[in-house]
Amino acid sequence: MALGERFDAALALAHRVHRRQKRKGTSIPYIAHVLGVTSLVLEYGGNEDEAIAAVLHDVLEDVAEFGAGLTADALSREIETRFGGTALTLVEYMTDTVWHPKPPWPERKALHLTALGQAPPSALLIAAADKLHNVRSLIRDYRSAGEALWERFNPEAGRDRTLGYYRAALELFKARLPGALTDDLEREVIALEELVSAGGNNVHRG
């Protein structure tokens, strides 16, 4: 499958929204996560619409804080006009809020998992790729920072809520998206749980 000009345009739009944004607690440009998720979607068989939605999967959620004057409503219209209704619908399934400040983390994540329980397979593909990329990042960062990671990554959620959220997401994908992607996510979630359970014995510093 060749990716065309719509995909190029989606990359440009994502960079426009995320240009000033970094991964939580790091100096890593946020677009690195966007590209990582998109790569996973393609590696696990995604089509161009799914790849476009993966590129744009966080723009509606982050535009109010980082989008340099754009609004979620205007951005939704732009996505639908430039990339079609399918891409917009998939991005909406990936969005847990368009408000800034964001509502409380537990409330947002519970509602998002409920929405994913009704989501089409294309949205589940993107969501599972997003979780896989995040869990791999958490494993890498935990090995470096240990328990300090949770304060840096998401102090509102902390360790137990974060681990519980990824376990709940995994169980949803096991029920609704069986296959290689969910199998790989399960291996990584278990690896993260075991690493944390070891109490920092596998943490490398310096």
Language-model segment annotations:
Residues 1-206:
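Active-site helical microenvironments for divalent-metal-assisted chemistry
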